[in-house]
Amino acid sequence: MKFGIEFVPNEPIEKIVKLVKLAEDVGFEYAWITDHYNNKNVYETLALIAEGTETIKLGPGVTNPYVRSPAITASAIATLDELSNGRATLGIGPGDKATFDALGIEWVKPVSTIRDAIAMMRTLLAGEKTESGAQLMGVKAVQEKIPIYMGAQGPMMLKTAGEISDGALINASNPKDFEAAVPLIKEGAESAGKSLSDIDVAAYTCCSIDEDSAAAANAAKIVVAFIAAGSPPPVFERHGLPADTGAKFGELLGKGDFGGAIGAVDDALMEAFSVVGTPDEFIPKIEALGEMGVTQYVAGSPIGPDKEKSIKLLGEVIASF
């Protein structure tokens, strides 16, 4: 099992750099930085992380081909690869329709858009010209092939991830979700003459770890509420939860009733949408994900009640694998 960690760049960048360095020191192999217009710029953040670290692989987790053109992303990730001496990884997904609506961006043909974007970026990163004549001139990646991970959720995206990417970043925390997702990734990989073992299947989890299990759970409840609000009915059905659960949380959060939303998060929702607990409780949960085909565990928001302490505790977990 490989281990990654996600940070949202909404804190001072100096703090994020220190936390990523700590993660590197305790054994994390990947750092994923979210890319959203209302936070700090992902590539400027990554550049400073590259300067402050030595071995950890790093990249956006995830960008999209609507807000940033594939050519701009290719240039940015090649520059990051140069700055980090060959440690760049690229996470790209279809994005969030609600965000695009707020920005006045039309969200059309996500599967074909992702497919075309990855093809263009691979061409540019190889130093070649695209059919329309675009070519990177003043920047060249250190790696011969920068790994490209696809953020994927739905069946078509999961199959496409298996077909054209090096890894799949899946927003899920429960083995049941990977029991459904991994066969689709495998199908896509085999359609392209690859095998499932060629794909790094990453569980992008809602993670909260602490020496106090209850404190860990409490820190994750607001994140679980937002995950529930954004999940479609089939996900709830998979976990034996009422199909209208998402609508209920959407209503609570929509009117700003965060306390009500937190209070409505029960044990079944926590089990479905998070990995929480003490280090001893974490180990079997990560092992269960591995049994379903997960090859990278990503510790996502909130990480824990105290990020620095929680990263050190995750280091204890990593040492068990």
From Swiss-Prot:
Localisation: Cytoplasm
Thermal effects: Optimum temperature is 40 degrees Celsius.
Pfam families: Bac_luciferase
UniProt KW keywords: Cytoplasm, Methanogenesis, One-carbon metabolism, Oxidoreductase
Highest taxon in the source lineage: Archaea
GO molecular-function term, one example from the UniProt record: oxidoreductase activity, acting on paired donors, with incorporation or reduction of molecular oxygen
A biological-process GO annotation: one-carbon metabolic process
Pathway: One-carbon metabolism; methanogenesis from CO(2); methyl-coenzyme M from 5,10-methylene-5,6,7,8-tetrahydromethanopterin: step 1/2
UniProt keyword annotation of Transferase present: no
Predominant location category: cytoplasm
pH-activity dependence text: Optimum pH is 7.
Gene Ontology cellular component list: cytoplasm
Annotated catalysed reactions: 5-methyl-5,6,7,8-tetrahydromethanopterin + oxidized coenzyme F420-(gamma-L-Glu)(n) + H(+) = 5,10-methylenetetrahydromethanopterin + reduced coenzyme F420-(gamma-L-Glu)(n)
Catalytic EC class: oxidoreductase
Protein's UniProt keywords contain Cytoplasm: yes
EC number annotated for this UniProt entry: 1.5.98.2
Inducers of expression: Increase in abundance from the earliest stages of exponential growth, reaching a maximum level at the mid-exponential growth phase.
Disulfide bonds listed in the record: none
NCBIfam families (UniProt xref): F420_mer, PRK02271.1
Family: Belongs to the mer family.
Further comment: Oxygen-stable.
Role: Catalyzes the reversible reduction of methylene-H(4)MPT to methyl-H(4)MPT.
Protein name: 5,10-methylenetetrahydromethanopterin reductase
